[in-house]
């Protein structure tokens, strides 16, 4: 039952092989046993989970269950949850209990999913290793001396270790896809605006997007279907017809399920910088795609090399504005001793924020300051437009773009802690997708040295989530990398 897919759990619940309460208890007990070694969870809501499970059992008995009714999951700790701590991995919000649910949380509650708790994350989603959390580093289930990736490292590690079958995440520059790659799970970031950001604590508002983690593309499709949907409370949320992503996974007729699919391989993604073990796994995955009927074509993303510098101007600029609301006045950490109001602001923020958050606030404030706005922020926005245009030129030649999710496998905890630039470069293949607002997915495609997972990234055109999920699903029907477990 622990390793069952969401569809298998659905059948077990519907046929009364197991109850929602029994299933929730099974995973809660597993969290209690395994989480101390992984630190994947910040908050475990046993009482709330069992209450939700009892309600799910009532829905099943009444014949009104949906695909996720009674299925356990966890939320990244930046989604507001009514009555439950929402810390964003920060001392600043260590005692913050949200008075309302995020849109994603309320949709999943309505679907009958059972939330077991809140997962650990890089502080305010700023990081690529899950080492900046106020609650300590998350450890990779495949090797607990290594990072799981970030910033959604807790969600990725929880799914990889089967502490939960599903988890939510957020992706600003790769924060779903990169940890999915490092922990051997599947993760998808949809098109910007497909998932509401209401109640999702902001890092960089023009880049942030909620995403989904599961063992497989099928599991992610079921979760994303429930998460996505128009929300008038988020001005960037797109009012468009709802999609059933799971329904799009049906195979095409014939022995070559991906016949006719054109996969673009950006030459910039396969240049220097990719580790040999990652390259070998990615090449083998592409061979498997060709065997399934896809054809590969070389494309170019000439401005891809500028994505990281552009991102580290735009994202900190937006963060410096978004995080100005955390001042110790109405909620959040307040310094115990201060002289006047200005001193209270300074001390509360100095004590409440960690080093990486302070670094990005300083950078963001600098690039928005008088005399530097045109030189940095405006130029970065121009680069962003060029990157988006590069993708559109590439999609004129292909249906899906593929490449490595990360240039290396997971590194040792502490290895890059004192070198922010090296940490930032771990997202070199993922950041451009956020700058362009495109959907991206990472799925397991093999192992590198030390049996550390490697992920393949698939990038789609706008609203191409169904195609990405269906493409990954066909690969997973012909391979078993997504079935491998750390144990």
UniProtKB/Swiss-Prot annotation:
Q: SUPFAM superfamilies attached here? A: Amidase signature (AS) enzymes
E.C. no: 6.3.5.7
- Alphabetically ordered keywords of this record: ATP-binding, Ligase, Nucleotide-binding, Protein biosynthesis
| GO CC terms | glutamyl-tRNA(Gln) amidotransferase complex
GO MF term list: ATP binding; glutaminyl-tRNA synthase (glutamine-hydrolyzing) activity
Record-annotated active site: 76, 151, 175
What does the entry give for GO biological process?
A: translation
Keyword NAD appears in the UniProt entry: no
Catalytic activity reads: L-glutamyl-tRNA(Gln) + L-glutamine + ATP + H2O = L-glutaminyl-tRNA(Gln) + L-glutamate + ADP + phosphate + H(+)
Instruction: Name the Gene3D superfamilies for this protein.
Output: Amidase signature (AS) domain (3.90.1300.10)
Entry's NCBIfam families?
Answer: gatA (TIGR00132)
PANTHER family named in the record: GLUTAMYL-TRNA(GLN) AMIDOTRANSFERASE SUBUNIT A, TRANSAMIDASE
UniProt similarity note: Belongs to the amidase family. GatA subfamily.
What does the function comment of this entry state? Allows the formation of correctly charged Gln-tRNA(Gln) through the transamidation of misacylated Glu-tRNA(Gln) in organisms which lack glutaminyl-tRNA synthetase. The reaction takes place in the presence of glutamine and ATP through an activated gamma-phospho-Glu-tRNA(Gln).
- Oligomeric form and interacting partners: Heterotrimer of A, B and C subunits.
UniProt protein name? Glutamyl-tRNA(Gln) amidotransferase subunit A
Q: Which organism is it from?
A: Azoarcus sp. (strain BH72)
- What gene is this protein translated from? gatA
């Amino acid at each position: 039952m622990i390793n069952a897919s969401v569809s298998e759990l659905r059948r077990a619940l519907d046929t009364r092989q197991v109850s929602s309460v029994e299933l929730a208890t099974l995973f809660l007990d597993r969290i209690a046993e395994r989480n101390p070694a992984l630190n994947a969870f910040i908050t475990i809501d046993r009482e709330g989970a069992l209450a939700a499970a009892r309600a799910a059992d009532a829905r099943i008995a009444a014949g009104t269950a949906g695909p996720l009714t009674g299925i356990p999951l966890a939320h990244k700790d930046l989604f507001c949850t009514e009555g439950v701590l929402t810390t964003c991995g920060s001392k600043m919000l260590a005692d913050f209990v949200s008075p309302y649910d995020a849109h994603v949380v309320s949709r999943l509650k309505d679907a009958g999913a059972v939330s077991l708790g809140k997962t650990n994350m890089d502080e305010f989603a700023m990081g690529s290793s899950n080492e900046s959390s106020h609650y300590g580093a998350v450890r990779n289930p495949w090797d607990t001396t290594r990072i799981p990736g970030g910033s959604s490292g807790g969600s990725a590690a929880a799914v990889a270790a089967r502490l939960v079958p599903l988890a939510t995440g957020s992706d600003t520059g790769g924060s779903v896809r990169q940890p999915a790659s490092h922990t051997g799970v599947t993760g998808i970031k949809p098109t910007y605006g497909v998932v509401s950001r209401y109640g999702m604590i902001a890092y960089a508002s023009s880049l942030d997007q909620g995403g989904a983690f599961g063992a497989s593309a099928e599991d992610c499709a079921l979760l994303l279907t429930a998460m996505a949907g128009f929300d008038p409370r988020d001005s960037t949320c797109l009012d468009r017809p709802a999609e059933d992503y799971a329904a799009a996974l049906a195979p095409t007729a014939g022995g070559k399920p991906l016949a006719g699919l054109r996969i673009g391989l950006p030459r910039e993604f396969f240049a220097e910088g990719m580790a040999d073990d990652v390259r070998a796994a990615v090449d083998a995955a592409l061979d498997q795609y060709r065997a399934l009927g896809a054809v590969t074509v070389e494309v170019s993303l000439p401005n891809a090399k500028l994505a990281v510098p552009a991102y580290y101007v735009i994202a900190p600029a937006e963060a410096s504005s978004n995080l100005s609301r955390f001042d110790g006045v109405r909620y959040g950490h307040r310094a115990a001793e201060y002289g006047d109001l200005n001193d209270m602001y300074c001390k509360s923020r100095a004590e409440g924020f960690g080093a990486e958050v302070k670094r990005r606030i300083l950078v963001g404030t600098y690039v928005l300051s008088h005399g530097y706005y045109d030189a940095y922020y405006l130029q970065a926005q121009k680069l962003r437009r060029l990157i988006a245009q590069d993708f559109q030129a590439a999609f004129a030649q292909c249906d899906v773009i593929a490449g490595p999710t990360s240039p290396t496998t997971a590194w040792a905890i502490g290895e890059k802690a004192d070198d922010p630039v090296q940490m930032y470069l771990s997202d070199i293949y993922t950041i451009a997708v956020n700058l362009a607002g495109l959907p991206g997915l990472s799925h397991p495609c093999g192992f590198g040295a030390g049996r550390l997972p490697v992920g393949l990234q698939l990038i789609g055109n706008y609203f191409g989530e169904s195609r990405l999920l269906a493409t990954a699903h066909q690969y997973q029907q012909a391979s078993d990398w997504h079935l491998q477990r750390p144990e």
